Curated annotation (Swiss-Prot):
Keywords: Cytoplasm, Differentiation, Spermatogenesis
Localization of this protein: Cytoplasm, Cytosol
Known tissue expression: Restricted to testis, where it localizes to germ cells.
Keyword Cytoplasm annotated: yes
Native organism: Mus musculus
Reported phenotype of the disruption mutant: Males are infertile, while female fertility is not affected. Testis size is significantly reduced with the phenotype apparent from postnatal day 28 (P28) onwards. Testicular histology appears to be normal before P28, but then cell aggregates begin to accumulate in the center of seminiferous tubules. Sperm development arrests at the post-meiotic round spermatid stage, associated with increased apoptosis. Adult testes completely lack round spermatids and spermatozoa.
GO cellular component: cytosol
One Gene Ontology term from the biological process aspect of the record: lncRNA transcription
Name this protein carries in UniProt: Protein TOPAZ1
Length: 1653
């Protein structure tokens, strides 16, 4: 035993991969890490030691078994490495179980090796018959008992107990090691790991299949021996001991099964299981590595080959037995009854009796090949697994319902995984101690390439004979084949395991993923599949046993096949017995050891893939697996071929013997069939083989559809498809994608599975794939309605099978040529592109078919089976990069991939869980070492994930996202996922590529590469060719168009034919040819556009948009431009949700004056509204406005519909208003179009209106003309015509005024503006003049009134016709004012004058003297009339604005104005309007208007009496200046004041104030003591007054006294004497005068002294 190596750190996984690969090359078996068994109990450890002892014995007994065990160990190691993140419910229990299983797996493995010889010696037929009976009984049970969960759980538990008891008895020492419950908890993860194990088992099985017949014999013999020994042991053992041992065995089985899974878990969590498992794993890893070197060296030694096969078979058997034991242990824990022992022995008999087909070899042969106790364990496990399978299926169905995995379900999952790679599980146990071996084993499982020098790793094509193990096809073929036998459940498990493996291989982080989560997901998917396969579970073993049995099971019970796949792992032995036909075919295929090994690997891979698909719910894997399984069913030889991933003695098969092994390789290649043409020739008739190939091609071609369909298809259906797809390698991987999504989604629907099985079974017998094809087509058409699958399948199959054999043959490279190429590539050219590519014919054939099918509708999947939270979504990539990268992987596939992907992308399909699963699978595949496969699968899974996250409304965005997923350069996950998928999908890259493009189907997203061992730098998933020479060759091949099918365009020589005439386009970094048509080649553009539109592929439409934009940005449209082509291009772009390109093309077309049809614009609006693309509304509105500006005139209905769509798209009010404004403009334009801007017709219409006196119609006509006329001059001309019409239509008998009706109609226009006011004003002036000339004051006034109402300032306008057109403003105002005056409206006249601002003659508005005179007279008339109405203020306003006062040069009419002013002043004084009187007096004084002094004196007196002393004094001073008062007589120093007697007291007082101020100095000096002077006041008698009586003079005396009294302060005067003239003389008292001066001198001095008198 090797010392246990420290468990590899997840981050060191790549290194482990390398070590594993090295070991594989050396053929060294990989030992499971003891850390996995860290949780084992003491009893389990004891059993482990016994297992080690038996293992040593078995190793000595059979090198072949060791080799096979190594392979299985490697697979187990890979499984052990499977990432286990996000543990799900029940994961702990499962993990514990898996740990226990790991230890018991070691023990069982040892026991198997020891008992290998014994098992071989057992009665082969007896054991096989018993097992077969067991399986059939189970089938019947499954059929009879639809609720298989309960029955299966019970039966499975019983079987587990019995099997465990028997197993314990048979291998008491070896199976004593029971893993701790922690291992059992990991069982579900182990199931995933088993999927990986199966993937790894592909390699192991390939090795085992080097001698599949021997393995089968040994298995049968071992099974018989084991069964007998078990029977004896059972008879001897007591129930209690049996129960205990069964529990132990169960733990061991669970541990082995979980150990596979625990390998991954170990990397993530369990680092302490390295002790026991490491030694055994190292042992098997060394053996497997030795075996790998034998394969690489092509050792032709029959002995070595035999040993390898034996070892492989032993390992497989050990793994299977261990897995079965683990499952049995789990089930045994649940059911400790001993009844299941019998059924288990029967299952062992069946297995021993029937030769296992390559699938069985992949699954059971490994177990059987182990011989001895392992064989017994396998037998017991198979029985137990049968019941367990039922229970597991039942549990799986429940788990799909988010329930915890039942032991039965779990056991079934484990059984399927174990069956596929039980020896792998054992292998893993041995490898587990050595993380390197384990990672290497995983890599070897996923990778078919040899170990390359340190400089780099080389990738070998799947079909290449140089491949020692099918990297992708290990998983794919193994999963598919196992799936065909085991059923969709197991295949799904295996596939999930593979996915985990892939994830683990590529991403150490993926290892962190909890196996429990993966297991739960797998369980849920598996449960769903079980639900769909409940009735099929009972017949799982028989189906697994042989293709024939499978067919029968399918025909009898469609569910049986589904059940069988799920139970396949556990019942491989029994299935081998029942599936005699399949086993026979497998044996025939096994005749070719190489192909047989490949087939086994492929089967294991397929099974694991399918299981993974189911678990992942990504139906992609399931689909691919299903396709592989179908292929296996149709041609068991193909199964062997697929399982020939690793052969001990690798030989280039001859034409005769290549049928088995080459077929598997061919199946891996996407172009070639699931099995090589040679294999087809051997296993099937030439025609049938070709038909199968054709069907395969069709299946591959319909891969994208199949993906969608498969997503909906139940596991059974997935199995059939997998088989069919395996026949068409591409379709298998492709279908794997499809199934992964849909199978998971519809696994729970057994009806679909049944229909699928039926079609499969029928076609299998006929070696036709119509069922598969039909199924695929059905799935693509009726994925949502599974019932329609069967009829559609027949039709589609018939359609596809109609292809001629020659056409089918085109899809496959020449066998002999491939043989030669393989030999050369293997031995001579390490980097020959032939290893990476497929013949151009095959590519073209598949491309054409795939493209056709891709165009067919796909059914989106919306039912996620499992939730993989731990999945890592790879980076996004653009579709262009994706196509290029895929092209690098496989140009032919790329074509197919591109077309289907585009078409698939058209139809959104959502399967988040499926996508997650595919991602998971991708990561695990990376762990396996299939980087390129991982990258591809990562792409697919990423695309799936993208589809998951994408909203349905944003399908277009989703498609772009999917494309972006592929384009993502820095997404390491994408690389790993892509590589993993490359490895997984193997020959199905075509379909895979197409799938990744399809957003809706996550399965579609996965693009299956055809290269396996390429590691990507982290930028692209594209294979990196390390050898420059190889790169050149590859580039040269691509440049030559070898991988691309021309589109049939006639392109000039200077143009790049790849760019214009191929789907994928030009991929040269620097192309010397033209990619955009040159000037003058517009016809070529149109031809290219028509072709691309007819092909209706998204990438071509992308390219068409690019060419359109590049060409018409440089050159204007010519004579060859076709607007219909532009419209069709836009419609096609819009159908593919390429809204961005639509906007770009439309904008450019508008700039180039190439307006698309209005319906295009409406469709864009409809799309934006339907998708609720709020962000696209602004750009769309901009395009709409450009449409309108460019001359498009949509109907009002269209505009209303656009507004409705904008509301639906939740556009803003501003955006909607933009459309409404455009609608208004369009209305104007429409009116203009209606009237045609025909002014003459409009004028004639005016005449019509005049004749009819329909002025309202004339107004409407004006509005129409206004909106239609583009030039204002034309509008003025029309208005002049209207003005003439309005003025000429004078009829006295008509009371109405035409202008008024016209103006009212125009003013009611909603768009009535200032322009309208101006035009109406000018028309109104013409009307005013007209009525003024006719002295029609009333009608003229009505015109002025309507102008006033409309607030039209006509005073600043001119008329449109006649003299008024040149009339000055003063004249217009005069006419209007005169009309108001004549009509009796002074207010109207004043309003007109005020409106004109009383302007008469200005530089801007010059006028002649006549107009001024007219104005003066008009104003005087108005003033006189107003003054008569006592409107003093208005009168003064009018008089003040007389022309003579505005311009100094105009002195006319002064005399007339003086009278008016004096009259006004008198009237104001009389009315006591002192304010206006004062203003008038001041204005008259200022303007030197002669004033009547009497009016002035009266005004002064009135002001004084009214105490308005300031104004009174001002006017008194003015009166003095004017000579109204006599000057002051005498010298002021004389101290004498002469006061006329006619003055009023106010006037006298004002005179006294002047006297005081004038003598102020003397008065004040007298107060200082100077001699006082007497101030005398003489009241003069006037001549006029002389004639008057004394009374008048005496009144004057009294006024003088009063004046002195009213003074403030009062003045005292004394009568002194009477002079000679009889005039009274008075003296002013000095004291009072002094006092007055003191108080009033300040203001009095200012008022009186500083004025000129």
């Amino acid at each position: 035993m090797r010392p246990p190596a420290t468990p590899p750190d997840p981050t060191k996984e790549p290194g482990c991969k390398g070590t594993t690969r090295g070991l594989r090359k050396r053929g060294l078996p990989l030992t499971p890490e003891p850390g996995e068994g860290g949780g084992c109990s003491l009893e389990a450890r004891g059993c482990e030691e016994e297992s080690r002892q038996k293992q040593r014995m078995v190793t000595q007994a059979s090198g072949r078994e060791e080799t096979e065990g190594d392979k299985l160990a490697k697979e187990n190691g890979k499984i052990t490495e499977a990432p286990s993140d996000d543990p799900q419910p029940g994961t702990d229990l499962v993990r514990k179980t898996s740990i226990t299983s790991s230890e018991s797996l070691q023990t069982v493995e040892c026991s198997e090796f020891q008992n290998m010889a014994f098992l071989q010696s057992l009665d082969k037929e007896e054991l096989g018959e018993g097992i077969k009976r067991r399986m059939r009984i189970k089938k019947c049970k499954s059929l009879e008992n639809p609720p298989l969960e309960i029955t299966k759980n019970e039966a499975t538990q019983n079987i587990k107990v019995e099997f465990q008891d028997e197993l314990f008895k048979n291998t008491p020492k070896h199976s004593c090691n029971s893993l701790s419950p922690g291992v059992e908890k990991n069982c579900s993860f182990e199931l995933h790991d088993y999927s990986f194990l199966h993937s790894e088992g592909c390699n192991n099985e390939n090795n085992f299949e080097d001698k599949p017949h021997d393995v089968c014999l040994h298995t049968e013999e071992n099974s018989l021996k084991l069964k007998k020994e078990n029977l004896r042991n059972l008879a001897e053992k007591d129930d209690t001991r049996t129960t205990t041992k069964l529990l132990k065995t169960e733990k061991s089985v669970i541990a082995s099964k979980l150990l596979l899974e625990e390998s991954h878990l170990y990397q993530n969590k369990n680092n302490g299981l390295t002790s026991c498992l490491q030694s055994e794993k190292n042992k098997y890893s060394v053996e497997e590595n030795n075996t790998g070197r034998k394969h690489r060296k092509k050792m032709k030694s029959g002995k070595e080959e035999k040993n390898i096969n034996l070892t492989l078979s032993n390992v497989c058997n050990n793994s299977v037995l261990v897995l079965q034991e683990n499952q049995m242990g789990m089930e045994g824990k649940e059911a400790e009854t001993l009844e299941p022992k019998k059924s288990f022995l029967k299952a062992l008999r069946k297995i021993n009796h029937n030769t296992l087909p390559p699938v069985d070899h992949l699954c059971l042969p490994k177990t059987v090949g182990k011989t001895s106790s392992r064989h017994h364990i396998n037998a017991m496990l198979q029985k137990t697994l049968e019941s367990s399978l039922k229970e597991d299926i039942k549990n799986t169905s429940e788990s799909l319902g988010c329930k915890r995995i039942e032991p039965e379900k779990y056991n079934k999952s484990m059984i399927s995984s174990t069956v596929k790679s039980p020896s792998d599980g054992h292998h893993m146990e041995k490898r587990s101690p050595r993380g390197d071996l384990r990672s290497e084993t995983e890599e070897s499982k996923v990778s078919c390439c040899r170990t390359i020098p340190m400089t780099g790793k080389r990738v070998w094509p799947f079909y290449s004979c140089a491949r020692i193990s099918a990297q992708c096809w290990k998983k794919t073929s193994l999963s598919d084949l196992n799936y065909s036998l085991l059923g969709p459940l197991e295949n799904v498990r295996q596939h999930d395991s593979i996915i985990h493996q892939m994830n683990q291989t590529h991403l150490p982080d993926s290892k962190l993923l909890q196996p429990s989560l993966t297991e739960r997901t797998t369980e849920s998917s598996r449960k769903e599949m079980y639900d769909s396969d409940l009735s099929c579970l009972s017949s799982v073993s028989s189906v697994e046993s042989t293709v024939m049995d499978i067919k029968e099971a399918m025909s009898h019970d469609k569910k049986t096949k589904l059940e069988e796949p799920s139970r396949n792992g556990a019942e491989v032995v029994s299935n081998a017995t029942e599936d005699t036909q399949l086993s026979n075919i497998t044996q025939s295929l096994t005749g070719n050891k190489k192909r047989k090994g490949n087939l086994s690997k492929l089967n294991l891979t397929v099974a694991s893939q399918e299981s993974q698909e189911t678990n992942n719910c990504a139906n992609k894997t399931v689909h691919r697996k299903v396709c592989i399984t179908k292929q296996t069913l149709v041609a068991p030889d193909l199964v062997k071929i697929l399982n020939t991933g690793r052969l001990t003695n690798f030989k280039i098969p001859l034409l005769k013997n290549k049928t088995g092994k080459r077929g598997a390789v061919s199946a891996r290649s996407s172009e070639r069939e699931a099995y090589s043409p040679l294999e087809l020739l051997d296993s099937l008739s030439g025609v049938e083989a070709k038909q199968n190939r054709n069907k395969e091609n069709i299946c591959t071609t319909s891969g994208p559809q199949s993906l969608n369909l498969h997503s909906c298809i139940a596991p059974g259906q997935a199995s059939s498809h997998s088989f069919y797809n395996k026949n068409s390698c591409t379709s298998s991987s492709f279908t794997k994608k499809g199934y992964d999504n849909k199978a998971c989604n519809h696994i729970s629907e057994p009806g679909n599975i049944i229909s699928n099985k039926e079609s499969i079974s029928m076609k299998i017998e006929n070696n036709t794939f119509s069922c598969d094809l039909g199924y695929i087509d059905q799935s693509s058409f009726c994925s949502k309605k599974q019932e329609a699958f069967v009829p559609i399948s027949s039709e589609i199959s018939g359609r596809k099978m109609t292809k001629s054999i020659s056409e089918l043959k085109l899809g496959f490279p020449d066998i002999l040529k491939a043989y030669e190429d393989d030999v050369l590539l293997i031995d001579v050219i390490q980097d020959d592109p032939e290893l990476f590519g497929i013949s151009s014919e095959g590519d073209l054939s598949f491309a054409s078919e795939v493209s056709k099918i891709s165009q067919e509708p796909r059914v989106s999947e919306d039912q996620p089976t499992a939730d993989f939270k731990h999945m890592h979504l790879p980076g996004k990539k653009e579709p262009g990069d994706l196509s290029k990268e895929v092209a690098l992987l496989d140009p032919g596939l790329l074509k197919l991939e591109s077309c289907p992907s585009l078409s698939a992308a058209k139809e959104p399909q959502h399967d988040p869980e499926g996508a997650a699963i595919s991602l998971e699978a991708t990561e695990e595949t990376v762990v396996s070492g299939s980087l390129e496969g991982l990258s591809e699968q990562a792409r697919a899974s990423d695309s799936d994930a993208k589809c998951i996250s994408s909203d349905k409304a944003t399908v277009m965005e989703e498609q772009e996202s999917t494309h972006e997923i592929f384009k993502s350069k820095d997404s390491r996950n994408v690389e790993s996922a892509t590589e993993c998928q490359l490895a997984t999908l193997g020959p199905n890259p075509l379909c895979s590529s197409a799938l990744p493009v399809n957003l809706s189907s996550h399965q579609d997203v996965v693009s299956t590469p055809w290269i396996n061992d390429v590691r990507f730098p982290g930028r692209h998933s594209v294979l990196q060719l390390q050898n420059p020479e190889t790169c050149e060759i590859f580039k040269r091949e691509k440049n030559m168009g070898v991988f691309q099918k021309p589109l049939g365009l006639l392109i000039p020589h200077r143009y790049c034919k790849l760019h214009f005439n191929t789907l994928r386009g030009c991929e040269r970094a620097q192309c010397k040819f033209v990619h955009v048509p040159e000037q003058g080649d517009e016809k070529i553009c149109m031809d290219v556009f028509r072709k691309y539109i007819s092909v209706n592929e998204q990438r071509l439409l992308h390219r068409a948009a690019y060419i359109f934009l590049e060409y018409y940005r440089k050159f204007p449209p010519g004579i060859h431009f076709s607007l219909q082509v532009l419209n069709d291009l836009l419609i096609s772009l819009l159908k593919h949700c390429l809204l961005k390109e639509v906007f770009q093309v439309v904008q450019l077309s508008i700039m180039a004056k190439m307006l698309p049809a209005l319906k295009i614009l409406l469709k864009i609006f409809e799309y934006v509204a339907a998708m609720k693309l709020r962000n696209a509304v602004p750009a769309l509105i901009e395009i709409f406005c450009k449409f309108i500006e460019a001359g498009m005139v949509p109907d009002p209905e269209h505009l209303n519909y656009i507004v409705k769509l904008l509301h639906q798209a939740q556009a803003s009010q501003q955006e909607i208003s933009a459309v409404l404004q455009a609608k208004s403009r369009l209305r104007v334009r429409q009116l203009k179009k209606n009237w045609k801007c025909d002014l003459d017709s409009a004028l004639s219409e005016v005449e019509t209106c005049k004749e009819k006196s329909d002025w309202t119609k004339l107004g409407n006509l004006y509005i129409s003309i206004k909106m239609s006329c583009e030039e204002f001059a034309d509008l003025q001309r029309f208005c002049a015509c209207v003005a003439e019409t309005l003025t000429e239509d004078y009829k006295e008998e008509r009371p109405g005024v035409p202008f008024c009706e016209f103006a009212e109609t125009v003013s009611k226009d909603p768009q009535y503006s200032e322009v309208d006011k101006t035009l109406l004003g000018r028309i109104g002036i013409s009307a005013v003049y007209f009525y003024h000339r006719l002295l029609l004051w009333a009608k003229g006034r009505k015109v002025l009134d309507i102008l006033y109402e409309l607030k039209i300032h006509f005073t600043s306008l001119k008329g449109l016709t006649g003299p008024e057109k040149e009339a000055p403003r003063c004249q217009i105002v005069n006419v209007a004012a005169e009309i108001f005056i004549k009509s009796g409206s002074l207010d109207g006249a004043i309003w007109v004058l005020r409106e004109s601002e009383w302007i008469i003659n200005t530089p801007l508005w010059p006028c002649d003297r006549m107009d001024v005179l007219n104005r003066h007279n008009l104003l005087c008339t108005i003033a006189h009339e107003i003054l008569g109405k006592n409107l003093y203020k208005q009168t003064f306003e009018v008089l003040r604005n007389l022309p003579s006062f505005q311009n100094s040069q105009e002195m006319m009419g002064v005399s007339q104005s003086s009278l008016l002013f004096n009259e006004l002043l008198d009237a104001c004084i009389e009315s006591n309007s002192l304010g206006i009187s004062s203003s008038v007096a001041e204005f008259m004084v200022a303007k030197s208007i002669p004033i009547d002094f009497s009016f002035l004196r009266r005004l002064i007196t009135s002001l004084g009496r009214s105490c308005l002393w300031l104004k009174a004094r001002a006017h008194y001073k003015s009166a003095l200046s004017l000579g109204c008062y006599p000057p002051l007589e005498g010298n002021l120093h004389r101290k004498l004041l002469l006061v006329p007697s006619y003055l009023s007291e106010i006037e006298m007082l004002l005179a006294m104030e002047i006297f005081l101020v004038s003598n102020a100095s003397g008065i004040q000096s007298a107060g200082m003591g100077a001699p006082t002077q007497v101030l005398q006041i003489v009241l003069k008698r006037c001549e006029e007054s002389k004639s008057r009586s004394k009374d008048e003079y005496q009144a004057a005396v009294e006024r003088l006294v009063m004046a002195a009294r009213i003074s403030d302060p009062k003045l005292f005067i004394k009568h002194m004497t009477v002079n000679i003239n009889k005039e009274q003389v008075y003296s002013l008292e000095h004291c009072s005068a002094l006092k007055w001066l003191k108080e009033n001198m300040k203001w009095a001095g200012k008022v009186w002294l500083f004025t000129n008198h």
